[in-house]
């Protein structure tokens, strides 16, 4: 009978796993779901520094050029002397090989910054752009504006899977990064109503975590553990955010607790 043929699959565990996978892949689209943005700084010697932001509704902020410095936060580095270089310079230069005439290379600041968005972001409205060491879009503050003349926006973001996007930019040691990353919302729900807007602002709390990695392999392992999208330096998608059938939607996955 057709009914009997349809019921040959009695793998209850697989059915449960499929339901779990479906639940995870729809969860980021629920109103109030968490957004997760990762700003990944790659340094000339192959080290990585990741700024991990989580919040509902929107993520906005700025990372100063001082925060991009690898040694930022150490006791010998402080914000009182903005124009001073790190006193322990030997920790932040690479010396040329023996016999080479190349000068030492400063590895304090990143040469590449990648932005990875995970969640139901409104990509058409997401913007990110460099600012100078004083947070300005022009060296003359009187000509500085709220947005850069050419921010990363809309179709410049490259999609990864269901709900992740990324962009890669070259960087300068005296630049910071400003980003404005809103979530998608129901068009019938007016976020700009005064009461609604006040509630959204009140409920939106941004959390930042900073991770240091000595190489890309460590970075890939962390992104994979946390179920975050990550395209590696060869533009290969090394990790995806959506759940699949190989384990990152598993009921017994311990990484979701840490």
From Swiss-Prot:
Keyword check for Signal: no
Coiled-coil intervals: none
Statement: the UniProt record of this protein carries the keyword Transit peptide: no
Family matches, as Pfam families: CPV_Polyhedrin (PF17515)
UniProtKB keywords: Viral occlusion body
A GO term from the CC aspect: viral occlusion body
InterPro entries per UniProt: CPV_Polyhedrin (IPR035239)
Function, as annotated: Major component of the virus occlusion bodies, which are large proteinaceous structures (polyhedra), that protect the virus from the outside environment for extended periods until they are ingested by insect larvae.
Subunit structure comment from the entry: Forms crystal-like bodies by self-assembly.
Official protein name in the record: Polyhedrin
